[in-house]
Amino acid sequence: MSYVRSKICGITRIEDALAAAEAGADAIGFVFYAKSPRAVDVRQARAIITELPPFVTTVGLFVNASRCELNEILEVVPLDLLQFHGDETPQDCEGYHRPWIKALRVRPGDDLEAACKQYAGARGILLDTYVAGVPGGTGEAFDWSLVPAHLSKPIILAGGLSADNVGQAIAQVRPYAVDVSGGVEQAKGIKDAAKIEAFMRAVKQA
């Protein structure tokens, strides 16, 4: 099987970002959504990014942010990739001069290929667990059998992943990448270096 990339999301501390990079994570994610327990401000995110080694992609997660708010963040924080995790239309995701991905919360009956075509400009589609009223970070996995074997966009699998189940998830879904947050934490927003290492080891062994 081809190399499966990984993102550690919900980074709030420099030491957690460095632990992710040291363990071999391809990307780290910053949550710019005030209602999240993993939210960061622009000063936090910028300070963390300045300490990162090269070749670690920085991702900003946004939930129905205004264009003005997002542009203000991008003026300060050097993000490589944008992740839209709310109800954004394809038009809402365009115009920032950054590559972007769109998160979808998966429910039975969803036409994921139609969504891939709808968000034609996305570099990939992130599949997360649907919980009413919660845009993400639920810590719950969804039914992976809902993911078709072949989709026209690279798939990033999220939702309730941990070192214990990511190998099975990769074997079943065969995603382009996996995304973890709560599965490598000791508390919300506080990562656990040993859990990050265990998760990355499981990804590499899958």
UniProtKB/Swiss-Prot annotation:
GO terms for biological process: L-tryptophan biosynthetic process. Gene3D superfamilies: Aldolase class I. It catalyses: N-(5-phospho-beta-D-ribosyl)anthranilate = 1-(2-carboxyphenylamino)-1-deoxy-D-ribulose 5-phosphate. InterPro entries: Aldolase_TIM (IPR013785), PRAI_dom (IPR001240), RibuloseP-bd_barrel (IPR011060), TrpF_fam (IPR044643). The keyword NAD does not apply. Pfam families: PRAI. This is N-(5'-phosphoribosyl)anthranilate isomerase. It comes from Pseudomonas putida (strain GB-1). The lineage of its organism: Bacteria, Pseudomonadati, Pseudomonadota, Gammaproteobacteria, Pseudomonadales. The gene is trpF.
